[in-house]
Amino acid sequence: MIIQSKDITKPVRESADVCIIGSGCGGGASAKVLAEAGKKVIVIEEGGYFTSGDFDMTEQTAYQNLYRQRAGQSTDNLAVTILQGKCIGGSSTVNWTTSLRTPDFVLEQWSKIFDVGGLSSKDLEPYFDRIEKYLNVHIEPEENHNPNNRIILDGARKLGYTAQASGRNTRDCKKAGACGLGCPFDAKLSVDVTYIPDAIKAGAAVFANFRADEIDVSGKLKRVFGSVVDQSTQKVKTDFIVEAPVIIVAASAIHSPALLLRSGIANSSGEVGNHLTFHLTSAVLGVYDRIIYPAGGIPQSALCSEFLNKNNDGGGFWIEAVPVYPTLASLAIPGFGNGHKELMRQYTNIGASIVLVKEIDSEGAVKLNDYGRPSISYNFGGRDLEYLKQGLKLAAEIHFAAGAKRVMTLHSQKTEFTSPGEISGVLANAEWGTNEIALYSAHPLGTCRMAEHPLRSVVNSHCETHDVKGLFVIDGSVTPTSLGVNPQMTILAIAEKSAEWIAENRLKKM
């Protein structure tokens, strides 16, 4: 069952074998595994509960109901916009369905540098196999790629680079283009229509609009204290307490460390909130003399990853298509006044690609502000900046190869090319400082780092905190490094594997 704040009229007191904070990939997968193992599971989610009938394919509704800060969450200096879901299903409800396995070189690095055990490619293969079957992860046939994805496939191949289709977790996709706004057809097999319903079927209880404020681990039973929030007004209605011997924090790489910091727990290493990575992202736009319509069709089904770890340094970049909805386009498209209006009038003829950087020199941190909410910082530079420049150059070349008449980046000062020969010179003279180029992330990672040494990490290889037995963090915050792929498959696999370990080793007798 799903209990919403509108159903609550008095303080809530509950107990369970395990309380899971967050209902995205980490929390949802953990809930299903543990509920099906016969454990009493309670999931609490700060966001609301919405179904396909609530998804009207408009940005106004989606940003208000499904995203953190109405899609306006950012670093403190406003340099990086951070897109995260805040609803049952978490970010899986609003992602673009790309489903990729963790690269082998990343898992090898985790083992060699951080002594992570049990997460090799061989260890995770059965989990990936099972998840891909469960979520119907598949490659789209050639005829299903929309014009925006064809830019990458056709343009990269014309230049002699490798581009390929990417896996997607959908079934009977209607190609409506609304993945980022909530799928109105339940065709996207996100956590809200897969793991959460199956967890409920196995006996789990899910509470929507329940915000975890603090965790107390001082007693025999751990306790989660929080607030029941009205979905419409966002005002606190009452409070809740959930008691359980096992707590799983699965609130994302931004909000999991914030919760631990507010609670004053699991931080003997001083590492809670550190090592934030973003897969820092910017975009390249091409203007064509044909209709592209960047918000139509399957939003993301192709990529070029040839330059990921090409120098064997663990870094690099990859390029994907990005669906550009009108409101998002109006914010991202460079220029002011008549120039901006002229570009928006050509909206249907614009193709958009994103460059995502797998950081090796850059990282940030999540701390607490004066109100106990996340304060997010990020320092970008070194080899990562060079990879971003290389990626933007390649993406621009791909657009020209695909037939674009002019191409632009998202610099605050006009940065536009009318031929491939102009790209290098224009980018060399562009400004790259803070807020000089629009930067984004939908993949915050790493703020509760996993490693076997307790002085350099927050959790061990089973996602259990070094400091508190029975307290786990299971979400994107545990990755020791950035991934180089969209993270949902990695998080799901780690969650399923860790939840199995919890059932066998921490809840065996329950």
Name every feature range the model reports, one short phrase each.
Residues V33-K40, G47-S52, D56-M57, K201, ...:
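Glycine-rich loop(s) and the adjacent beta-strand/alpha-helix scaffold that form part
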Residues Q60-E140, V355-A365, N369:
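Redox-cofactor-proximal catalytic regions of oxidoreductases
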Residues G24-C25, I254, V478:
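Residue-level detector of alpha-helix initiation sites
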Residues T481-A499:
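A conserved FAD-binding loop/helix module that cradles the flavin
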Residues N95, K237, S269-H399, G433-N435, ...:
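FAD cofactor-binding and catalytic pocket of flavoenzymes
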Residues M1-V18, E36, D76, E496, ...:
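Extreme N-terminal leader/targeting segments of oxidoreductases
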Residues V18-V43:
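N-terminal Rossmann-like FAD-binding beta1-loop-alpha1 element of flavoenzymes
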Residues I113, G117-E214, S218-L221, R406-I437:
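Conserved redox-cofactor binding core of oxidoreductases
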